[in-house]
Amino acid sequence: MRYFTAGESHGPRLTAIIEGVPAGLSLSAEDINIELKRRQGGYGRGGRMKIESDQVEITSGVRHGKTIGSPITLNVTNRDFKNWEQIMAAQDVEDKIKKQRRLTKPRPGHADLVGGMKYEFEDLRNVLERSSARETTMRVAVGAVAKKLLHELEIEVANHVVNFGRREISSPEHLSVQEIRETAGRSDLSIFDESQAEDLRTYIDQIKKAGDTIGGIIETRVEGVPAGLGSYVQYDRKLDAKIAGAVVSINAFKGVEFGLGFEAGKRPGSQVMDEIIWSENKGYTRSSNQLGGFEGGMTNGEQLIVRGVMKPIPTLYKPLMSIDTESHEPYKASVERSDPTALPAAGVVMENVVATVVAQEICDKFNSDTINELKKALVDYKKRLSEY
């Protein structure tokens, strides 16, 4: 299973093509729209979310509500395109139009300057349009398909925010996906402890009033994953490495950890490793889950615990200094549109990205033409594990 996305932030539409989804999976536009709506929610969101109300159109790979094994094409229309039709036109236009909304003042923390240097662009809008977080719309759309497939296999995924800036959100060590959905899933801050919500909203409002932004830490948990996904045999087959790469590929994510994560580097080994236990009923399990469900690049049958670190949104209403690429004169960086935080929305993106990687790994391991064949292969594999 693999996918590609295409489209610019202010272009006519965003597109994703997914190849390798087994035939026979029930799938509707509404399955995807539910996830897209989640991405557009959350406290601290602003301008663009009022303009866009994302709805997907499935144009291939699904017939009469079922996948048919061919590539699935997903399209999301950019409703704001009507205001950018000439500026973002594919055909050549007059110079005076080209100069409209031209960007020569790169924003610190964005791809603007380096992208312009790499591709020899005079107008940095060519970089901004593709590097924008708007692209994550299609990462979520793809993830919605992956989550539908995982649900059929009794694998579930959820996320919650564990830090807003320096504000840590309290949550229990043992936390099920269902508990996350029943708490963080109903919170506009995506937090487990709603008693901290009002203080956090005040904090976010203060950040916004100051013209600043904040980042934080998001945790995604996956349940129902069997032991043995991924491999220790080669570096590029380790599933935790694949997930880490996918998470830091999300706009503004700068780090990832599993289980204890970086805390493991501060503890002695006896306080980090998960002891192995066995019972006739459950087979091999662990007494704890400090390693976040991974050993040797493989899933060990425990819940997957993945955390991603999101930097503050780099577009600031109190802009930092930059250099005009045309005149080389100092200038205050441009403001396109910005929110004080996008952590709740970023959590939805991370959740769907992690789901996609897990679904890809399952489809690769149990290469199946149909969803029924895939289900049977997974059942047979679990049976083999239980007999070890």
Curated annotation (Swiss-Prot):
It comes from the Bacteria. Keywords: Amino-acid biosynthesis, Aromatic amino acid biosynthesis, FAD, Flavoprotein, FMN, Lyase, NADP. FMN binds at residues 130-132, 251-252, 296, 311-315, 337. InterPro entries: Chorismate_synth (IPR000453), Chorismate_synth_AroC_sf (IPR035904), Chorismate_synthase_CS (IPR020541). Reduced FMN (FMNH(2)). One of its GO terms (molecular function) is chorismate synthase activity. Homotetramer. This is Chorismate synthase. It comes from Lactococcus lactis subsp. cremoris (strain SK11).
